[in-house]
């Protein structure tokens, strides 16, 4: 066969001889053709399989192998280890498979372990083929298919990890069943039945030897009888290909990504599933409980004054504590958090046993940590079944590690309880009934997980109903993210108890209006934020990675006073040795709370007396929208909303055409700025007919027919609107809804990129109309402009504002009106005014650039950056003489001022109310 990149094998018609010009013939080195016509895809696939064994492939560095009978088509990409199978007539639809021929390599899904990706892709192909052959989509049929796939996954793992004899499942399947797949279902049904039969069950004595050789599995995995789906030749071959993978190299904790690869993408998007990498899982479980257990272990061993037998006693006590805890994931998906938590606890237990052994006690060590300590609720049936399977496999892995390290372990088979995994809607379940506690005061339960996210505009009707159920009794909750439901239910579960919680969430619940809605009622339950990871971009190993920014938040109940039998007050705690300790309540100090802040290299841990709902060091006070500014400054209002159906707005071309047709119209045309036009220098125009007299308006059809036509279209659009306010506006169809047009104003865009250090703002005059995509401060001063352009104000904005995706969504009521303004003398205000003008001068010196370009942090001109830095230093000094180290320190200072200002305002309001009440009493 020739080189050049192609290998060709004939399917039904037989391969050709050796080819030249870059083609390698099936006969000359590809293993020959299929020999005669007919046979369909099974023959083509067989020809391709034979071709892959040819020594000519390596010799000639061939990239693609192809086999076809001109009805069916199969190809193999050697470099990508990828297979294409399709009807010959559909070949053109699959051109992307051959893009490497044009120099475009196909992208590959990232995984830290390539075996995970390959297994996920092959399982996906197998699932697709089975679904195509079995069209029943009833809930019962889908559940049966889900059970079937998890049973296959178990068999693949079992034969590669020592549960079954090596390769026994795949070899039996390949050696006994027919190539056309007609008896594959019957084979699997018989095998699954045997796997559910105990060693002395009569069915084993009657079974064929190749079935009886398989051990009893138990654990419920094969207990129920479900129909096995129909197979054809291709499905059987895909099944065998899956079996030939090395499943020993695949981690059960990657099952989330594998699961994601085989379910419907639309369903995946609807469920909002964001599968979690192991490092991100550890962000939740380490500070939630692992760090405490590891510290206890280290402290026991570190004390050189403690006798060996005392250390052994304390190590046993710690191990017994591990055996008593419960881990509960109320949105467990395919079990990733539970699996990692289980494996980490088992690993710590192994280290405890090794330490006991090294201290001179050579016992027979058997694990006290069992799967029935792990609880999960998952709404998706397949994911729930996968979670059960994954926990069994994780148990087998840890039993093997236990055996390797300590020389003895309980056998994996028969399987034991797979934990408490419930396929149900977590938000409609009673968590207390599902994960019960004998004593809220003593039982350790750790709630952990990554619940689904869903903003107010991205929720299904069912999810909205979930929120109505979860937040029953709340006046406001619809603006909350869907994930907030889990925090609220979790907070109710852990209140007044030893239970703790750590959940991954979209960072929106720590921003904007959501903060007061969610966190005020949570804190009212006497719960605090015990630790938190500030915002970081989400990354996981699943296909089509979800583009979100997340936080990790840990919650715990405040220590509560409880009456002892003698009437004294005490607080309850666990000691380092795992025992229970009563401490004097008055002497108990709150443990420091840990705030994990991102740095260039890693995470920096800051200890704080309290973590605010904005995930900074500070009080629990939530900033709330207000209608007036906290300081004595100019008010901020929305720009002008047109509500015109687009008929009062003109492109540059439309503007020129209108002026050409009706030259007198030029006096009514003004420049129009939304946030995009403002930031990126784009041009739009509008008809601003505010000053039109009644006579001019009446004569428009004769004097300006094009403008009149536009006005009539506005009137029609407003009358058709379901909004009554818009219908009312039809009475003045020639005007925008809002009519703000001051002589001068400061424009503040409502949406700005998170990359910018400063939100770009500008002074504009009455010749420019701003839409409601911007805020405006009519007749704002240069001093106000200077404060707003400082880092002090921008750092405040970054913390308290909401987000549109990850961009800043500037709110006048939530950012501007709540901002604590400094006490500045007239001279200080004059200095800020001059520094603000310097910023405008620096912009003017770079007049060829848009504001988006000027405020790109990578391209900001030096003179503009220096002007801002000079302003920043001056504004900082208005707040205190000592320089601020960073933005967080500024915000912490501002929150302290905000708290004082709000308290003073409330005190003044109370005094006025009391004075009024006093006057009323005097009159009475």
Feature locations, PLM:
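Non-catalytic DNA-recognition/assembly elements of restriction-modification systems
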Residues: 332, 706-717, 818-924
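Long, low-complexity Q/N-rich tracts
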Residues: 2-34
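Signature of N6-adenine DNA methyltransferases within the class I
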Residues: 45-50, 59-65, 71-118, 139, ...
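Short, ligand-facing micro-motifs at secondary-structure edges
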Residues: 534, 753-768, 786, 795-808
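Segments forming glycine/polar-rich beta-alpha architectures that bind adenosine-containing cofactors
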Residues: 238, 624-772, 889-924
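Preference for the N-terminal adenyl/adenosyl cofactor-binding alpha/beta module
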Residues: 88-344, 373, 377-386, 390, ...
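Proline-centric
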Residues: 289, 328-330, 377, 490-496, ...
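Conserved catalytic cores of phosphodiester-cleaving nucleases, focusing on short active-site segments
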Residues: 1-2, 33-53
């Amino acid at each position: 066969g020739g080189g050049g990149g192609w290998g060709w094998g004939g399917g039904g018609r037989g391969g050709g001889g050796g080819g030249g010009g870059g083609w390698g013939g099936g006969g000359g080195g590809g293993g020959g053709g299929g020999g005669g016509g007919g046979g369909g895809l099974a023959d083509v696939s067989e020809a391709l399989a034979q071709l892959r064994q040819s020594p000519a492939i390596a010799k000639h560095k061939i990239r693609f192998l192809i086999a076809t009978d001109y009805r069916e088509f199969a190809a193999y990409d050697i470099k990508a280890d990828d297979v294409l199978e399709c009807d010959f007539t559909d070949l053109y639809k699959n051109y992307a498979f051959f893009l490497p021929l044009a120099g475009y390599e196909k992208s590959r899904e990232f995984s830290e372990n390539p075996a995970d990706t390959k297994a996920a892709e092959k399982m996906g192909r197998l699932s697709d083929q089975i679904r195509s052959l079995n069209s029943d989509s009833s809930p019962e049929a889908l559940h049966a298919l889900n059970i079937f796939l998890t049973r296959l996954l178990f068999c693949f793992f079992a034969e590669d990890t020592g549960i079954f004899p090596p390769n026994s499942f795949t070899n039996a399947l390949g050696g006994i069943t027919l190539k056309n797949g007609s008896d594959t279902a019957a084979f699997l049904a018989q095998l699954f039945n045997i796997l559910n039969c105990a060693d002395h069950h009569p069915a084993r004595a009657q079974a064929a030897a190749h079935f009886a050789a398989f051990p009893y599995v138990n654990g419920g995995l094969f207990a129920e009888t479900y129909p096995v789906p129909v197979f054809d030749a291709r499905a059987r071959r895909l099944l065998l290909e899956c079996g030939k993978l090395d499943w020993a190299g695949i981690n059960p904790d990657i099952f989330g990504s594998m699961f994601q690869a085989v379910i419907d993408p639309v369903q995946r998007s609807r469920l909002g599933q964001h599968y979690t990498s192991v490092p991100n899982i550890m962000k939740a479980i380490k500070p939630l409980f692992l760090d405490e257990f590891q510290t206890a272990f280290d402290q026991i061993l570190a004390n050189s004054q403690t006798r060996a037998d005392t250390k052994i006693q304390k190590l046993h006590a710690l191990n017994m504590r591990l055996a008593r805890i419960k881990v509960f994931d109320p949105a467990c998906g395919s079990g990733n958090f539970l699996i990692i938590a289980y494996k980490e606890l088992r690993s710590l237990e192994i280290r405890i046993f090794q330490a006991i052994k090294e201290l001179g006690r050579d016992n027979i060590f058997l694990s006290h940590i069992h799967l029935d300590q792990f609880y999960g609720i998952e709404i998706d049936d397949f994911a729930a079944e996968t979670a059960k399977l994954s926990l069994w496999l994780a148990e087998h892995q840890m039993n093997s590690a236990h055996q390797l390290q300590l020389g003895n372990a309980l056998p994996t088979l028969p399987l034991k309880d797979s934990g408490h995994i419930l396929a149900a809607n977590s938000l409609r379940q009673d968590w207390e009934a599902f994960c019960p506690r004998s004593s809220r005061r003593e039982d350790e339960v750790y709630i952990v997980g990554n619940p689904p996210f869903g903003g107010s505009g991205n929720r299904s009707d069912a999810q909205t109903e979930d929120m109505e159920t979860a937040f029953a009794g709340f006046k406001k909750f619809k603006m909350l993210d869907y994930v907030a439901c889990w925090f609220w239910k979790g907070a109710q579960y852990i209140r007044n108890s030893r239970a703790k919680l750590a959940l991954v969430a979209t960072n929106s619940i720590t921003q904007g209006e959501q903060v007061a809605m969610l966190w005020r009622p949570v804190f009212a339950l006497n719960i605090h934020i015990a630790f938190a990871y500030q915002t970081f971009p989400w990354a996981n190993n699943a296909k089509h990675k979800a583009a979100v920014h997340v936080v990790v938040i840990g919650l715990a109940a405040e220590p509560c006073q409880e009456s002892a039998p003698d009437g004294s007050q005490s607080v309850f705690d666990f000691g380092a040795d795992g025992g229970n300790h009563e401490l004097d309540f008055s002497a108990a100090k709150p443990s420091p709370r840990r705030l994990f802040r991102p740095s260039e290299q890693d995470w920096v841990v800051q200890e704080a007396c309290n973590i605010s709902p904005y995930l900074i060091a500070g009080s629990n006070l939530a900033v709330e929208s207000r209608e007036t500014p906290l300081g004595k400054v100019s008010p901020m209002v929305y720009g002008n909303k047109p509500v015109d159906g687009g008929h009062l707005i003109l492109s540059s071309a439309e503007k020129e055409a209108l002026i050409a047709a009706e030259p007198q119209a030029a006096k009514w045309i003004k420049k129009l700025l939304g946030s995009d036009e403002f930031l990126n220098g784009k041009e739009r125009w509008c008809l601003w007919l505010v000053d039109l007299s009644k006579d001019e308006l009446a004569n428009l059809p004769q004097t300006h027919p094009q403008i009149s036509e536009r006005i009539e279209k506005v009137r029609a659009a407003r009358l058709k609107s379901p909004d009554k306010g818009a219908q009312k506006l039809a009475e003045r169809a020639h005007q925008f809804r809002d009519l703000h047009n001051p002589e001068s104003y400061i424009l503040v865009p409502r949406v700005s990129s998170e990359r910018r250090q400063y939100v770009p703002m500008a002074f504009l005059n009455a010749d420019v109309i701003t839409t409601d995509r911007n805020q405006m401060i009519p007749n704002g001063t240069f001093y106000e402009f200077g404060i707003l352009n400082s880092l002090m104000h921008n750092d405040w904005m970054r913390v308290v504002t909401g987000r549109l995706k990850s961009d800043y969504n500037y709110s006048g009521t939530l950012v501007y009106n709540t901002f604590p303004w400094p006490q500045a003398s007239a001279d200080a205000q004059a200095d800020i005014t001059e520094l603000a003008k310097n910023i405008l001068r620096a912009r003017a010196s770079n007049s060829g650039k848009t504001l988006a370009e000027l405020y790109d942090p990578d391209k900001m001109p030096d003179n503009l950056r220096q002007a801002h830095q000079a302003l920043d230093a001056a504004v900082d000094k208005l707040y205190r003489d000592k320089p601020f180290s960073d933005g967080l320190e500024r915000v912490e200072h501002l929150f302290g001022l905000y708290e004082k200002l709000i308290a003073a305002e409330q005190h003044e309001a109370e005094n006025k109310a009391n004075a009024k009440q006093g006057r009323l009493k005097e009159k009475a």
